[in-house]
Amino acid sequence: SSFLVEMEQIALLFDYFEGEIPEIRQDQLLIVFASHRHGDHFSPAIFDLAENHPKIWFVLSDDIWRKRVPEEFLCRTSFLGPGEEFSFQKETGEKVPVTVKAFKSTDEGVAFLIEAEGKVLYHAGDLNNWVWEGEPEEYNCRMSEAFHSELLKIAGNHIDVAFMLLDTRQGKDFYLGMDDFM
């Protein structure tokens, strides 16, 4: 679930929860995203990154409890719910224009659409077409409808990089979300 994107002036770290992170330049703005509260998408360890990165900001799904954020980082944290948008330039005075839009997940939390440095990136989090063998057809239909409803909100954006789900637990339907997105 974790991805690191390094751009010219910023670095974006998505859903970090464990493992070694490559060295990130200290002069870059580091924006750390957590799409939801599940342990494979969010870890309090993200706040330890501030030791080596004075220019750090956290963008967390609003399903992550505020009390999980250390007090000293609340002023550098934005909580986003579905349909909300955050502009770093407007809200923080950062010279690098970065805009983040949040979309409702079909599981927990949000997906992110980020515009930065002339590029558009999409991180799905757990927004997926969660069709499962053994679930009632009505459930799978509702899940597909909810997924397609969110995709319609994203449609029309020229996305340069997308981080999507391929979950083999879905059996033969593992590719549906990726296929629908493409």
Predicted regions located by residue number:
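Divalent metal-coordination and catalytic microenvironments
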Residues: V5, H36, V100, D126, ...
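Metallo-beta-lactamase
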Residues: L60-G118
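Cap/insert and terminal regions of metallo-dependent hydrolase folds
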Residues: V59, W132-M182
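Active-site metal-binding motif and surrounding structural segment of the metallo-beta-lactamase
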Residues: E18-I64, L152-F163
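Conserved beta-strand hairpin/beta-sheet module of binuclear metal-dependent hydrolase folds
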Residues: S1-I24, V110-W132
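A short acidic, amphipathic alpha-helical/loop segment
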Residues: P44-N52, E71-E72, L176-F181
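Short gly/ser/thr-rich secondary-structure transition/capping motifs
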Residues: L12-E18, F103, R142-A146
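Active-site metal-binding loops of divalent metal-dependent hydrolases
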Residues: D15-E18, H36-R37, D63-I64, S105, ...
